[in-house]
Amino acid sequence: MSRDILHRYLFDNADVRGQLVQLEDSFQAMLAAQDYPKALQVLLGELMAATSLLTATIKFSGDISVQLQGDGPVSLAVINGNNELQLRGVARWKGELAKDASLPTLLGKGYMVITLTPDEGERYQGIVSLEHGTLAACLEEYFNQSEQLPTQIHLFATNAQAAGMLLQVLPSKQEQNDDFSHLSVLTQTIKPQELFDLGAEEVLHRLYHEEEVRLFEPMDVSFKCTCSRERSAGALKTLSLVELETILAEEGKIDMGCEYCTASYSFDAIDIAALFSDNADTSQTKTQ
């Protein structure tokens, strides 16, 4: 059974929708890029689950970024992805982190920045303070600010798995909250191990066995890095030829490592010369 799936569901007897996401292989692939401390592994797992839920909730075609910034020992944690739930992530930290460190302890004072870049149309950015204590509470506040929709979020992670649930009033029914309040109480009984070990149908049956739940086709979630040799070459072109030749003289080659995965791209003197030869040809073509 695949462990990297997002399920969407509706209640036929209530104006409420839900989502359930379970991550394993994609989460492990993301963690493999760096030797993250345990607390940071958990944070990235919650953030990956949160980004999956957010992406599936907002109807758009394009890219999404959910970024945590703070003045604590963790200065940055970010998940980037697209509407096809192809995600990647990275974090930066300094010093030792307690295994059970909370969000405020890890990031201090800071913000969650959610950026949507649609294939067509204008870019949108929402900012929420991290003062709400947990990542789930911050995401609930985001929906409260941007959509004005009652929303409940549950996020769980270990160093091996991540999972999450979202419960939300349908956009056209936000004034009717009785059903949502009832279902919220039921959803709050979910246990992390149930989300880690059980399939979606069994989880939903345990939570809502007296409700009429309609489960839709699952959506695959995957780890996918967008790095490439061409992108690395583009980054090198932002430096001058003199700077690059200085590095080559000292190192013999230039290695470009990706923060998001374990890929590395190596450039020698011939490669660098070819890059700037291409620039020269392009420049000449434009001036002719």
UniProtKB/Swiss-Prot annotation:
Q: What is this protein called?
A: 33 kDa chaperonin
GO MF, one term, reads:
unfolded protein binding
What is the species of this protein?
A: Shewanella denitrificans (strain OS217 / ATCC BAA-1090 / DSM 15013)
Query: Which HAMAP family would you find in this protein's record?
Result: HslO (MF_00117)
Subcellular location, in the record's words? Cytoplasm
What are the BP-aspect GO terms?
A: protein refolding
SUPFAM superfamilies for the chain = Hsp33 domain, HSP33 redox switch-like
NCBIfam families, per database record:
PRK00114.1
Answer yes or no on keyword Transmembrane: no
The record's similarity note reads: Belongs to the HSP33 family.
Q: Please give the function described in this protein's UniProt entry.
A: Redox regulated molecular chaperone. Protects both thermally unfolding and oxidatively damaged proteins from irreversible aggregation. Plays an important role in the bacterial defense system toward oxidative stress.
As for PTM, the annotation reads:
Under oxidizing conditions two disulfide bonds are formed involving the reactive cysteines. Under reducing conditions zinc is bound to the reactive cysteines and the protein is inactive.
**GO cellular component: a single term:** cytoplasm
Gene name of the encoded protein: hslO
Tell me the keywords, alphabetical order: Chaperone, Cytoplasm, Disulfide bond, Redox-active center, Zinc
Chief localisation class: cytoplasm
Q: Which cysteines are joined by disulfide bonds?
A: C225-C227, C258-C261
